[in-house]
Amino acid sequence: MQIFVKTLTGKTITLEVESSDTIDNVKAKIQDKEGIPPDQQRLIFAGKQLEDGRTLADYNIQKESTLHLVLRLRGGIIEPSLMALARKYNQDKMICRKCYARLHPRAVNCRRKKCGHSNQLRPKKKIK
């Protein structure tokens, strides 16, 4: 039977499948046509995300049904060197006790007029 897969760009892909095909098989066919790895694909039908081990028949997907293809977003880990740089930039500061202005680490007086250029400074608290 023939089904359609619609991408977020509006492109429609036509696939030749059987109702006994698994979602894994469908994703492999999409990879063959579009080059998108199966682990980045999410297929939606009738508002539900289709699970890899199930078949098209399990979801009552019939001929000429339309599935929606969404790409999975992946997060990443920040490298330790970038983490140290971010920590230095965000945490190595002095804070004015009167107006809460963030100041450079070697500050002696606040730079703001509203607290009278106070010399009551404290280091910024460290995040655990």
Swiss-Prot record:
Residues 1-76 form the Ubiquitin-like domain. GO terms for biological process: translation. There is a cross-link at residue 76 (Glycyl lysine isopeptide (Gly-Lys) (interchain with K-? in acceptor proteins)). CDD domains: Ubl_ubiquitin. There is a cross-link at residue 48 (Glycyl lysine isopeptide (Lys-Gly) (interchain with G-Cter in ubiquitin)). SUPFAM superfamilies: Ubiquitin-like (SSF54236), Zn-binding ribosomal proteins (SSF57829). Keywords: Cytoplasm, Isopeptide bond, Nucleus, Ribonucleoprotein, Ribosomal protein, Ubl conjugation. InterPro entries: Ribosomal_eL40_dom, Ribosomal_eL40_sf, Ribosomal_zn-bd, Ubiquitin-like_dom, Ubiquitin-like_domsf, Ubiquitin_CS, Ubiquitin_dom, Ubiquitin_ubiquitin-like. GO terms for molecular function: mRNA binding; structural constituent of ribosome. GO terms for cellular component: cytoplasm; nucleus; ribonucleoprotein complex; ribosome. In the N-terminal section; belongs to the ubiquitin family. In the C-terminal section; belongs to the eukaryotic ribosomal protein eL40 family. Ubiquitin is generally synthesized as a polyubiquitin precursor with tandem head to tail repeats. Often, there are one to three additional amino acids after the last repeat, removed in the mature protein. Alternatively, ubiquitin extension protein is synthesized as a single copy of ubiquitin fused to a ribosomal protein (either eL40 or eS31) or to an ubiquitin-related protein (either RUB1 or RUB2). Following translation, extension protein is cleaved from ubiquitin. This is Ubiquitin-ribosomal protein eL40 fusion protein.
